[in-house]
């Protein structure tokens, strides 16, 4: 098995943490796993023997994309991987096409979400075509949630028999043992800012598609009712799909908002939240939702692809209609006024995450999938 190479692809090195622990787990199982991405510090953490740099741009750039495709074809021709597992949209497209052209036996497209869900017109057509080509070139598809699998099928992107969901879903699961409830100490400056208020939390990219406008509007409703609350937002403000200026000013200037651009370890921040609001418009799965639940924080999310897989409505959190900030505010108020409900939902969420979304489950299922392919190749 050692001589059969397995290539994992992502577009940019910043996406390598999506596979945190997975590469190491598979290599310990004597699998010759390599990583391909654009250059970056995350890729440099791996030995040159298994780390391959192929420059790729996240946005559509025809000339640059063709150059990336050619370099990928040359890499596959030289290294001859038996399995190519391509994740993230651009690497998914370039990787599956290159693997198809070079006739790599197993071509997996790991779908972590569909950007086309929140766009219209010509851009929708382009993104749909990209997904259609990638899924056609793939021999197998991994969807990171059951609802994402359903969306792929109903969008006529691929047939059901081509799609697998590992375990109960998620991008990579979570390493549950790291999510300790007693890890709640914040730097003094953050502790003073939160000041023992009821904390409404959010972790993720600060873009329209994540429902930031609804997060802000629901928070305004709660404040208008006289509750002593703080909004803790952890994430980076991005230029693509950027939020409205009024929302930007609210996040950066309102004294009841604590905005933190980036933290390497959000666990202590989760442990200082009373409720986690995840009003996303689309997801592949939504790992931040299960991270919050792992630390007994009730989650309020929306009824969209990916997010609905993370919460059992009324048991580990609440699911509301996409865009309905009044419903979000209603659920927040319910949780503010019922400490017993918060505790019950929190306990239920942690138990469910431990039982269903451990990284070990995802890794073992992926290992089993690879072993099946490798054993089939030995019999030929």
From Swiss-Prot:
It holds the Pfam family Glycos_transf_1. It comes from the Bacteria. Its EC number is 2.4.-.-. InterPro entries: Glyco_trans_1, Glyco_trans_4-like_N. It is an enzyme of class 2 (transferase). Keywords: Capsule biogenesis/degradation, Exopolysaccharide synthesis, Glycosyltransferase, Transferase. GO terms for biological process: capsule polysaccharide biosynthetic process. One of its GO terms (molecular function) is glycosyltransferase activity. Pathway: Capsule biogenesis; capsule polysaccharide biosynthesis. Required for the biosynthesis of type 1 capsular polysaccharide. PANTHER family: GLYCOSYLTRANSFERASE (PTHR12526:SF630). Belongs to the glycosyltransferase group 1 family. Glycosyltransferase 4 subfamily. This is Capsular polysaccharide biosynthesis glycosyltransferase CapM. It comes from Staphylococcus aureus.
